Amino acid sequence: GLNHETAPLSERELLKRLGLSHHAGEGLFFPDTYLFKKGTPDILIYRLAHDAMMARLNAYWDDRDPGLPYKNPYEALIMASIVEKETAHPADRDMISGVFVNRLKAGMKLQTDPTVIYGMGKKYRGKIRRIDLRTDTPYNTYTRYGLPPTPIALPGREALEAAFYPAETDALYFVARGDGTSHFSRTLDEHNKAVDKYIR
């Protein structure tokens, strides 16, 4: 197996050892299968995974649509992490990204539950309550505008591509149908009808 030399390090110490200035490691390492020799120091795998993520991010950034509302590749990584957590249905990723891009451009709050859950940390018990949506944390996109301060998950290639190449859509809302897919709406009235149909 690996030589686990980073085991005693805190997250911040690990990032410092890797020469990174980020405060959180979430999302900075590309999820993939990495081959290594027995006894390889784990720091090398972290470095390889980080380099793989940065290479992908920078390639997508150089090829991006100039109209995207991201100030830098890290903001696109944050968006990709939200898309990753928001759906397990691959066909919906581009549309969900398109909705969030539209909301950012319109100055609307993202209002996405996975960011609230991430901000709750260990307080999350499997269900979000109304009070949780009103309790402000740096990650609560119901109480704060814009993107959260860091990624909330490790996005895969499909979520990264969705963040950089979102669907062109007029939709501003979506709701889970219960079968893993989402229903998209252009107006709040349409969205409320969809919520009545699929949730209530």
Task: Please provide the spans of the model-predicted regions.
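Bacterial extracytoplasmic/cell-wall-associated proteins, especially those involved in peptidoglycan
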Residues: 2-9, 15-200
